[in-house]
Amino acid sequence: MKNLMLIAYLDLKESLRAKWFLIYSLVFGGLIALFFIAGITESQVMGFSGLSRLLLMYIQVTIVILPIFILITTVRSISGDRDNHTLEYMLSFPISLSQYYWGKISGRFITVFLPVFLAMVAAILYGAIKGAEIPWSIFLLYVGLLFAMTSSFLGIAFLISSIVRSSEMALGIAFFIWIFLLAFIDIALISIMMQNRVNDGVIISIALANPMEIFRVAAISLFDPELTVMGPVAFYILDAMSQLTFVIFSILYPTLLGLLFAILGYNVFRKKDLV
């Protein structure tokens, strides 16, 4: 455990010195600042106002930006260490493969989760100072969604980094996966299935297997428990499960998916030629 924590600390320290972390923090901190400057909390759209509307807009933007940030900054974790021989150097010490691998994941999780979480905390604190009503249920749900989103894409990134030896190839695969989850499943695949008159329930089930789609739906579930803004899609979701069950599912499913990918990545990592 001591070695694992040491690897996590070293990865965290390295990330904090990297330019990408500064940009990453500024993006999400800047989003919150921009929303306040633009007067988002002072306006009302579709019944959403105050901090509730700000958090809704923040999570909707984060759903798009956070996955690609996690993927492109993490897929080079192992492949990059292999390229510059850091991996070979680290394993020359009495450190096991599992300690190295899970230490890297732990350190990177803290690095990518902390800025998005602290940006939300800053919004809540600023709102409290201004005397705004704090939507605690929405805040806690979004913290859970951010945790699940970080876990799922971190697992995917480490699986890619374990399989691919080249950092450039890893970046290309990461970008393709992001585009695939963001657009292809929603637009191309579903359009083809609708043209072939596939059952609507099957189409929606495939769409909800996409973690990014899960986050989109869960993000509005507290504002709109009946999911009326989604139209007929809401009937399939709410017929299959209650709103509370769906919220729990939207957090547990991506988290377990990320853990599964991380375990698969570890199995690949320990069986491959490390150098």
PLM regions: where:
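Secretory targeting signals
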Residues: 34-39, 44, 48-63, 107-168
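Aromatic- and glycine-rich beta-strand/loop motifs that create alpha-glucan
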Residues: 1-25
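Helix-loop-helix units of permease transmembrane domains in multi-pass membrane transporters
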Residues: 77-109
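Long, hydrophobic alpha-helical segments
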Residues: 57-80
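Terminal transmembrane helical anchor/hairpin motif
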Residues: 38, 42-45, 183-259, 263-266
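A structural motif at transmembrane helix-loop-helix junctions in multipass membrane proteins
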Residues: 147-181, 185-195
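Hydrophobic/aromatic residues in alpha-helical transmembrane segments
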Residues: 67-74, 122, 155-156, 185, ...
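Start (N-cap) of specific transmembrane helices in multi-pass transporter permeases
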Residues: 10, 14, 99-112, 116
